[in-house]
Amino acid sequence: MDNLNKCLRVAGFLDNSLVNGEGLRSVLFVSGCRHKCPGCHNASMQAFDYGDSVSLKEILGRIEKNVPLIKGVTFSGGDPFEHADVLSELAEEIKDMGLNIWCYSGYTYEEIMDSNDESKISLLSKVDVLVDGRFDASKKEGAPKYAGSSNQRILKLS
C-alpha cells in the first residue's frame, strides 16, 4: 500500500463477530451514508462526521491481532462505497493477509458497476461477498441470513 497513513472516518470496529458474514470475522463500520433508509439499524453512522478519523495502519494493526482466529473482514456502516478509494487500498492489504471480505452496501451491484466510478469498481473487485440493496423495514421478515431485509441480495463475487 502506498500510504498506510491515509485516514478513514470509522464509526466502530468489532474484533470478532458471527453475525456480519460467514465465519468468525472482524467488522469495520465506516461513517457516512446517503441512502438514509428508514429504520436503519445503524442510523447514527449515516453522518459523515460521526466517529473518529483512524489511519489505515491502525485499522490493519487491529485486524492483524485477530489473525489467525478470523476468517475475514466485513465492511459495513454507513456505506463503505462512500469511501471506496481508501477502502480499496485497505481491502488489498486484507486480501494479502489471506482473509475474505464481505461488504454491506445500500447500492446494488448494478448501481456500482453502472456508476463508472473507478474507486467503487476497484473496491468491488476486491469484495468476495456483497450484501447489496437499500434496507427496507417493511421487508424484514423473510430476510436471508446476513441480510436486513428480503429485498437485499447476498452476492458471492469470488
Predicted feature locations:
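N-terminal [4Fe-4S]-dependent radical SAM core
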Residues: 1-29, 38, 42-48
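Class I S-adenosyl-L-methionine
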Residues: 2-6, 17, 25, 29, ...
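Short, flexible, glycine/charge-rich loop motifs used to bind or transfer phosphoryl groups or to couple energy/partner
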Residues: 17, 63-64, 118-120, 144
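Glycine-centered loop/turn positions within well-structured domains
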Residues: 35
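Core AdoMet radical
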Residues: 42-54, 68-83, 97-115, 124-138, ...
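Alpha-helical scaffolding segments of alpha/beta enzyme cores, especially the outer helices
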Residues: 58-61, 85-96, 118, 122
